[in-house]
Each structure stands twice: as structure tokens, then as C-alpha cells.
Amino acid sequence: MAHKKAGGSSRNGRDSAGKRLGIKTYGGEHVIPGNIIARQRGTTWHPGLNVGMGTDHTLFAKIEGHVQFRAKGNGRTFVSVLPIVAAAE
């Protein structure tokens, strides 16, 4: 006698929707205060200059400027927002 249950389809078919994580604003792109730079679980990317981190580890811009990603020697990647330098008139 078979002691394996038949592969019934009623046991299958459960899955969760994707959480839309990842980089939302790439290096060199312009941001304004409050723009989301990255959504993540944990600290894949760490906040650098002028970047804040929300309670769910979301990185966001604190000032207007351009996004910069920078890898440090310790294996961590930091995200900063560099202010826009006004042209001398």
C-alpha cells in the first residue's frame, strides 16, 4: 500500500505578494527632502550624510541634492545625499 498522500492541488497555491523592496533612487539622481532612496529589510545599505533611516530601515533624503553610493572597506555600503553647489554668478 502506498503511504504517500497524492500530490493534491488543494495543498498548493499559497504565496505572498512581493514587497517592492530595493533601490528607488539611483546614484547621481536628484532628490528633494523626503524622497525615498531605498526600501530594505535590515541594513543592506547604511545611511550616510544627509540621509535618514525610518523604523522599517527605509532610507530617505534629508536635503535636496544628488544621491551617492559609497562602499567602505568594512564591507558596508553607505548612501549619502550631496548638496547641489550653486554656480557662481
Swiss-Prot record:
**SUPFAM superfamilies of this UniProt entry?**
Ribosomal L27 protein-like
GO molecular function (one): structural constituent of ribosome
Question: One Pfam family for this entry, by name?
Answer: Ribosomal_L27
GO CC: one term? cytosolic large ribosomal subunit
Q: Which UniProt keywords apply?
A: Ribonucleoprotein, Ribosomal protein
- Listed HAMAP family: Ribosomal_bL27
Q: Where is this region: Disordered?
A: 1-23
User: Family assignment?
Assistant: Belongs to the bacterial ribosomal protein bL27 family.
The organism of origin for this protein: Rhodopseudomonas palustris (strain BisA53)
UniProt name for this protein: Large ribosomal subunit protein bL27
Alphabetical list of PANTHER family matching this protein: LARGE RIBOSOMAL SUBUNIT PROTEIN BL27M (PTHR15893:SF0), RIBOSOMAL PROTEIN L27 (PTHR15893)
InterPro entries per the record? Ribosomal_bL27 (IPR001684), Ribosomal_bL27_CS (IPR018261)
GO BP terms, alphabetized? translation
At the top level, the lineage of the source is Bacteria
